[in-house]
From Swiss-Prot:
Protein's UniProt name: Protein DETOXIFICATION 45, chloroplastic
Compartments (UniProt record): Plastid, Chloroplast membrane
Gene disruption: observed consequences: No reduction in aluminum tolerance.
Keywords: Chloroplast, Membrane, Plastid, Transit peptide, Transmembrane, Transmembrane helix, Transport
Principal subcellular localisation of the protein: plastid
Keyword Transmembrane annotated: yes
Residues annotated as transmembrane: 109-129, 147-167, 209-229, 250-270, 280-300, 308-328, 353-373, 389-411, 426-446, 466-486, 495-515, 523-543
Transit peptide: 1-75
Annotated source species: Arabidopsis thaliana
Keyword Transport listed: yes
Classification of source organism: Eukaryota, Viridiplantae, Streptophyta, Embryophyta, Tracheophyta
GO cellular component, one term: chloroplast membrane
Amino acid sequence: MESSRVVVGGGLPLANRRNSSFAKPKIQQGTFLPLSRINNVSAPQKCSLHTNPNPMFPFVTRRKSQTNPDCGVVKLGEEDDSCSSLDKLPEVNGVHTGVARPVDIKRELVMLSLPAIAGQAIDPLTLLMETAYIGRLGSVELGSAGVSMAIFNTISKLFNIPLLSVATSFVAEDIAKIAAQDLASEDSQSDIPSQGLPERKQLSSVSTALVLAIGIGIFEALALSLASGPFLRLMGIQSMSEMFIPARQFLVLRALGAPAYVVSLALQGIFRGFKDTKTPVYCLGIGNFLAVFLFPLFIYKFRMGVAGAAISSVISQYTVAILMLILLNKRVILLPPKIGSLKFGDYLKSGGFVLGRTLSVLVTMTVATSMAARQGVFAMAAHQICMQVWLAVSLLTDALASSGQALIASSASKRDFEGVKEVTTFVLKIGVVTGIALAIVLGMSFSSIAGLFSKDPEVLRIVRKGVLFVAATQPITALAFIFDGLHYGMSDFPYAACSMMVVGGISSAFMLYAPAGLGLSGVWVGLSMFMGLRMVAGFSRLMWRKGPWWFMHTSDKRLA
């Protein structure tokens, strides 16, 4: 969903120490170049290489592929020939800079995207399986579960996406600070290179994220359980509706898993801060495989219906959270010795803009579901099928956006604007190709896919009308997600939040009135408008000459 967008910390890159007095500056402890310092730059700054022990940008480079699998901290090593390393760096006016350019942007992007795609695909695919199993129970069950899922996602993800993004950034910054401190200590004592974080560390960012996740999860569970009736009525499901009882039962049971769900998302952000994307994928795979195994057992074998589906999901969520906590406990101390070491203020401040943006997205999607529910049982069931397929496929492009975001954040923190331009251009091209490919595949197979979710002829008839919405909008959706990732990589959170509020307001207003004359098609047109306006807003920001993307309109020579 929206998928969550990941912000990589803007810490100063660690680097290889050299056997040359010319290329061995003393790294100042805790020196970093956050993205916020370059976000509103209007012109490039020139810098030269000199022997000043306190240069503006210490002359440091990063060894290729030398990462610690345990925590993602760069390992330092010796270079036999500092002069040969100088040749590998780009030049500024004939002088080597301290910015190491990626050897192969395309390969690096692909390697980052593969685990991200796997992680993004697991939850939506499991949700598709759940929808398919529930759909075989009947249209009433499918429609009621669809409304309850929308409510659960709206409430639970309201704070989850900001928490995930901010946790990633803060954890990465904490790791970089500790590594810099260790390096400074070693420089004053010996020539033995740092090996990252070999032992458990106390990271306030990790502890704060976990405490916030637990508190938010408990609050969400209570809110969803105690206010299930009002939430359903707000979505258009009245007490006399045949969908009310199964929808309320499903929502109350799913609420029990809210704490685990929030904690697991926060843990994913923490592991990404450690630059470890494999561990979350393994844990998500185990938990979701368990859910897929339990769905038919509880729904059909034990004849629990939608309640069985909800219980299966709750068991899966707690399994994922527990596995991640066990593995994280091997790396860091989970809870701080004193409450004063937690930094709630930093989290709340940094997550404010992301929260506003997330709220705008969720409100728009909630309006769409609410207006679809008002069209009747068959229309709501068809809308649920279209939405699940659309979200599951479009989230795959979100993984590409997250990978591009990571590369952009890394290059921008080093003021490597040529690298940012290269990543941006390549990611946008891949986004267009991916969107067109998905549109073709879905256009040819969507009718067959719909049959997996329901056998009701009336539901299938309505679903076939949604082919244009699901398939044709894929190129637009792909670019909308990618633009979000690009702006997050440049830490352009204010624009991301404000533009989303405007886009969401326009789309929601359209969907509130269009269904009166267009029916369910009015909802789908409104959602297509939502993604189209997001794409336009993202592209417009890229074209601003005085914004954070000023360098996109500057020649390579001027950047140099």
